[in-house]
From Swiss-Prot:
PROSITE patterns: RIBOSOMAL_S4, S4. It comes from Mycolicibacterium smegmatis (strain ATCC 700084 / mc(2)155). This is Small ribosomal subunit protein uS4. SUPFAM superfamilies: Alpha-L RNA-binding motif. Belongs to the universal ribosomal protein uS4 family. One of the primary rRNA binding proteins, it binds directly to 16S rRNA where it nucleates assembly of the body of the 30S subunit. With S5 and S12 plays an important role in translational accuracy.
Length: 201
């Protein structure tokens, strides 16, 4: 599946948000790339909407075509389209692995899933965009538990808060999906209504 593989820090600086998570280069230079950063200009409504969509896409590592499909699905569901969209993005397996603290970044989580390190309800899943459901159980494969990424995850457990809709159990690093998240449980610097306004034109 296609995905953005360019320089993440440069993209973070352009969009004004740390897309990597703990990106020290971004923290040192949180202004747009260029010799002195882009001059401050009054942003048009369209530009703000487009930038918010790009922030969401690159935060979750989703290409435009797939992101559009997510929006269309969210728009068909009952409730607020923006809330539905974020819930869909959060329910991706790579994001769940990241949120559970088993990977430092979503990009790393995507790699771990693609390399076949996880079972969902006892079945191997190696598709990062796989959508989890309430009451799913996600396990690290037995032979993967002692590999370096999961050793590091155990050593650094607790450094990043785990959202209340997930639970990580014991040394086996089993992930329990208690529910799909409500908007208040999603800690992401996005104004999703701007994305809805962009696509609804």
């Amino acid at each position: 599946m296609a995905r953005y593989t360019g320089p993440a820090t440069r993209k973070s600086r352009r969009l004004g948000v740390d897309l990597v998570g703990g990106d020290q280069s971004f923290e040192k230079r949180p202004y747009p790339p260029g010799q002195h950063g882009r001059a401050r200009i009054k942003e048009s409504e369209y530009r703000q909407q487009l930038q918010e969509k790009q922030k969401a896409r690159f935060s979750y590592g989703v290409m435009e075509k797939q992101f559009r499909r997510y929006y269309e699905e969210a728009n068909r569901q009952p409730g607020k389209t923006g809330d539905n969209l974020l819930r869909i993005l959060e329910s991706r397996l790579d994001n769940v692995v990241y949120r559970a603290g088993l990977a430092r970044t979503r990009r790393m989580a995507r790699q771990l899933v693609s390399h076949g390190h996880f079972l969902v309800n006892g079945v191997k899943v190696d598709i990062p965009s796989y959508r989890v459901s309430q009451y799913d159980i996600i396990d690290v494969k037995e032979k993967s538990l002692n590999t370096l990424p999961f050793q590091i995850a155990r050593e650094t457990a607790g450094e990043r808060p785990i959202p209340s809709w997930l639970q990580v159990v014991g040394e086996r690093q089993r992930i329990l999906v208690h529910q799909l998240p409500e908007r208040a449980q999603i800690d992401v610097p996005l104004t999703e209504q701007l994305i809805v306004e962009l696509y609804s034109k």
